[in-house]
């Protein structure tokens, strides 16, 4: 019997708020579990135990049925998020089911684990965590993942994204970009107030940070080919979950 998939949330249709497919209409499947514990994580409930009672162990067919029940025929794209969904070898059955139904799959991971099913992902964002996260990137593992994708002719489906909270993070991002210059590269403003319910104050704060980051990138000759993004869903809905 296939091993179940630990699911915390299924929601949508909405839009993707981050990375290479920002603005893309999508459904979301959020899995539980992560091998990191980033200091500023905006989805810590996926790994800190606070939502343990909410985890549902589901088969690929059950997840797909719930997606269709919620989204009907109003979607052709599914984003798998976490936590770190790359920890789940058993996701292969679900991704294959999406492919069988002509539904594109997107996934974001920090780049610590490679899975063979990465080659089935249409939009794969690898987001190594910067110093502000208090995590340390293993570049050997990241090298292995990106080399494996290239060997499987999947370089067109992958991008790199680094979340920026401070100048040290920006320097880290430049190091990543220099190491992998041929991979599309995105910088994104980090949300440093993931608990506030004052949406207007949060939006003004994040837009100010976004402008400051754009100003820095604009004059940096090492960042001529990067794209600088806001966290779009936060500007629309604040810290609300399930949107």
Curated annotation (Swiss-Prot):
UniProt: [4Fe-4S] cluster binding residues: 34, 38, 41
Swiss-Prot/TrEMBL keywords: 4Fe-4S, Iron, Iron-sulfur, Lyase, Magnesium, Metal-binding, Queuosine biosynthesis, S-adenosyl-L-methionine
Ligand binding (S-adenosyl-L-methionine): 83, 127-129
Catalytic activity: 6-carboxy-5,6,7,8-tetrahydropterin + H(+) = 7-carboxy-7-deazaguanine + NH4(+)
E.C. number: 4.3.99.3
Pathway: Purine metabolism; 7-cyano-7-deazaguanine biosynthesis
Domain Radical SAM core: 21-239
Bound cofactor: record note: Binds 1 [4Fe-4S] cluster. The cluster is coordinated with 3 cysteines and an exchangeable S-adenosyl-L-methionine.
Keyword Iron-sulfur attached: yes
Cysteine pairings via disulfide bonds: none
GO process annotations (BP): queuosine biosynthetic process
Required co-factors: [4Fe-4S] cluster; S-adenosyl-L-methionine; Mg(2+)
List of residues binding Mg(2+): 43
Keyword Iron in record: yes
GO molecular function, one term: magnesium ion binding
Enzyme superclass (EC): lyase
Subunit comment: Homodimer.
HAMAP family noted in UniProt: QueE
Family (UniProt): Belongs to the radical SAM superfamily. 7-carboxy-7-deazaguanine synthase family.
Protein name per the record: 7-carboxy-7-deazaguanine synthase
Source species of the chain: Bacillus subtilis (strain 168)
Classification of source organism: Bacteria, Bacillati, Bacillota, Bacilli, Bacillales
């Amino acid at each position: 019997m296939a091993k179940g998939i630990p699911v915390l949330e299924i929601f949508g249709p909405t839009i993707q708020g981050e990375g290479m497919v920002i603005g893309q209409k999508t459904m979301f499947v959020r899995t539980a579990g992560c091998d990191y514990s980033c200091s500023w994580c905006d989805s810590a409930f996926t790994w800190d135990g606070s939502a343990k009672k909410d985890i549902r162990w589901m088969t690929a067919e059950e997840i797909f049925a719930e997606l269709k029940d919620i989204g009907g025929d109003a979607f052709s794209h599914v984003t798998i998020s976490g936590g770190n969904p790359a920890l789940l070898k058993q996701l292969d059955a679900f991704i294959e089911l999406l492919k069988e139904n002509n539904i594109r799959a997107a996934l974001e991971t920090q780049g610590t684990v490679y899975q063979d099913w990465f080659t089935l992902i249409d939009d794969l964002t690898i987001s190594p965590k910067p110093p502000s996260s208090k995590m340390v990137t293993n570049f050997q593992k990241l090298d292995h993942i990106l080399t494996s994708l290239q060997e499987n002719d999947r370089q067109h489906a992958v991008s790199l994204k680094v979340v920026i909270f401070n100048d040290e993070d920006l320097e880290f991002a430049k190091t990543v970009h220099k190491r992998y210059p041929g991979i599309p590269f995105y910088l994104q403003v980090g949300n440093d107030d993931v608990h506030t319910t004052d949406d207007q104050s949060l939006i003004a704060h994040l837009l100010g940070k976004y402008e400051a980051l754009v100003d820095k990138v604009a004059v940096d000759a090492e960042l001529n080919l990067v794209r600088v993004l806001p966290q779009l869903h936060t500007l629309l809905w604040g810290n609300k979950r399930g949107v």
